Amino acid sequence: MPRIFPWKLWRKSRPAWPRFLGTHPMNLLSQLFAPPSPVPSPTPKAKKRSRRGVQIKTPAEIAIMRQAGAIAAQVLKEIAATVQPGMTTGDLDQLAEERIRSLGATPSFKGYHGFPASICACVNNEVVHGIPRRRKKIRSGDLLKVDTGAYFQGYHGDSCITIAVGKVSPQAQRLMEVAEGALYAGIEQVKPGNYLMDIAGAIEDYVKPTGYTIVEEFTGHGVGQALHEDPHVFNVRCRDLPNVKLKPGMTLAIEPIVNAGSRFTRTLGDRWTVVTVDNALSAQFEHTVLVTATGYELLTDRRLV
């Protein structure tokens, strides 16, 4: 999922620099300390560069995305049925990759900007982008989030579930229910003529009365030929940000993240795993959703696989 950064706060205005003095010192510093370019996804090598802007999918593209979404849904359904205490998140990653490939697709996540696995596996206070590890055991009472994507014939399907491992606490169970309810509250707003902020408002209004919080800096997104396409799909109402009108043929990944405590997060030393700042539990659900002529269609519906 994409992260929103306030770049405008970083780019402060400065007085004009005389050309005869050469390159501005700040430009030299920016070049010297610029972060390395992200590692491009290795799959597929012949992939065309994604078109800019919000994409309206053709019927042929939608048919392929149904298959990509069904593969992602099938893998998550099997993981949910397989996971048990004593397994490791690395075991689940191996299962996911083998099943994605056996179903004729490739993992969307593996190699994406250098991410080393086919799933993101987050336990308890971990929010997003958890790296699966062979030594990381899953225990009874854990709240396990598994996010995966399948790349099939040039298009992606993206979905996430939260799994209660064994018997979880009442608080964990309630958090799961709220996170999933928030997802479907947002999905119910998907129809032609509505706007992205209708989705965001429905999610926000669903979560706010519960006392839980929504992680604001991570958003949903468009999905298709690229794993992350325009537009950003916000989970809270935002001012001064694009409020796109929904049209048939749009495909969106809607994915609210709900915390039991503070909404704020921090990133661990592996530069991927994001956790809650107060170690509170976190839950997430995600579907890839198609805007149809009359409403919506879930492309990652686990009930249909």
UniProtKB/Swiss-Prot annotation:
GO biological process annotation, one example: proteolysis
Assigned EC number: 3.4.11.18
Residue ranges of the TM segments: none
Stored InterPro entries: Creatinase/aminopeptidase-like, Pept_M24, Pept_M24_MAP, Pept_M24A_MAP1
Cofactor(s) needed for function: Co(2+); Zn(2+); Mn(2+); Fe(2+)
Top enzyme class: hydrolase
Residues the record lists as binding substrate: H129, H228
Catalytic activity: Release of N-terminal amino acids, preferentially methionine, from peptides and arylamides
GO (cellular component) term, any one: cytosol
Domain of life: Bacteria
Annotated family: Belongs to the peptidase M24A family. Methionine aminopeptidase type 1 subfamily.
Name this protein carries in UniProt: Methionine aminopeptidase C
Organism: Synechocystis sp. (strain ATCC 27184 / PCC 6803 / Kazusa)
Source lineage: Bacteria, Bacillati, Cyanobacteriota, Cyanophyceae, Synechococcales
